Structures are given as C-alpha cells and as structure tokens.
A protein has these predicted regions:
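Short, contiguous alpha-helical
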Residues: 5-64, 104-162
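Helix-adjacent hinge/juxtasegments
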Residues: 58-97
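Absolute protein N-terminus
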Residues: 1-3
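Mid-chain, well-packed structural core segment of small domains
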Residues: 87-103, 108-113
Length: 162
C-alpha cells in the first residue's frame, strides 16, 4: 500500500475510533463536550470541502458548521471513505495535477493534488489531538488516534480501542 493510500485508510480508522469513543461515552450516560464536537465538526467539514475542491463541485458544508453526534456520524459516512478512495485510487498523473481554488477567506491558491490529500489527513490529525484535549477537559477518556497506533492495530500488535 502506498503512503497516501495508507494515510487515507488511517484517517477513516481515526475518525471511526473517535466516534466509537464518543458513542460509548454517551451510552454510559456522559455528555459529549460541545468544544470536542465543535472541533470534530471542523475535521469532517474540512474533508467535505477538500473533496469538493478536488472534484470541482460546491461543498455541502461550511468550515465551522457544527454537528451533533448523529450529524457527525452522517457526515463521516459521506466524507471519510470518499477521501480514503481518493487517496487509494488516484494515479500518479492525478497526484501531480494542480487545482486552483479559493479558501474560506476568499484567497485564491494553486495546489498539487498529492499535497492536498496529505494535508487533509494531517489537518484532521492535528484537530483530533485538540478533540482529545477537549474530551479530557470534559471528563471523558480520549482515544489514541496516532498513526503508529493505527499501524499497531493493523498488524495485530495491540487490540482495538473501545
């Protein structure tokens, strides 16, 4: 598996692992901290925005649009696997292609597809770390969503997190 494809699969795993922890916490009678939901909403929204930019379509979501837990599940299902497929199925010519787009502040940019796909996963990882902090501050035990943890689970060296 090439690196970008592995990063796409990791991103799905990390989002699903985080959602499972939020679900189990809520099922145990705890409240999902709003700041954690706010930041994780941004993660999911950014995926939708990058997918739209890569496909030349309008994004269905805004950068800081907020979702409740069921909404996060819905948009994760709509975006995470699509991003994984882009990472997995994009050939060398497409990875080298440049796209022009406008960011949320209206600034125009030109970026290579390989850089965008890498950024999308790194951006999500950065913010999942912030979500973990907000979960801990809200009395929940966060998950370890590090890339190496994904690799260890994938190889059977550690058990999946609950």
């Amino acid at each position: 598996m090439n690196t970008i494809a592995k990063l796409g699969a990791f991103n799905v795993w990390a989002n699903e692992t985080l959602l499972r922890r939020l679900d189990s916490s809520v099922a145990a009678g705890k409240t999902a901290p709003q700041p954690a939901l706010h930041i994780f909403s941004h993660v999911i929204n950014a995926q939708a925005i990058w997918i739209a930019r890569l496909s030349g379509t309008a994004s269905p979501l805004k950068v800081w649009q907020e979702h409740d837990l069921p909404g996060l599940h819905h948009w994760h299902e709509q975006t995470s696997d699509r991003l994984r497929l882009l990472c997995e199925q994009t050939d060398e010519a497409e990875l080298a292609r440049h796209i022009q787009y406008t960011n949320s502040q209206g600034d125009a940019f030109d970026s290579q597809v390989s850089d965008i796909l890498t950024h999308a996963v790194m951006h999500a990882s950065y913010h999942r770390g912030q979500v973990a902090t907000k979960m801990r501050e809200g009395g929940l035990e966060p998950v370890n969503s590090d890339f190496i943890t994904y690799c260890r689970e994938l190889s059977g060296q550690v058990n999946p997190q609950q």
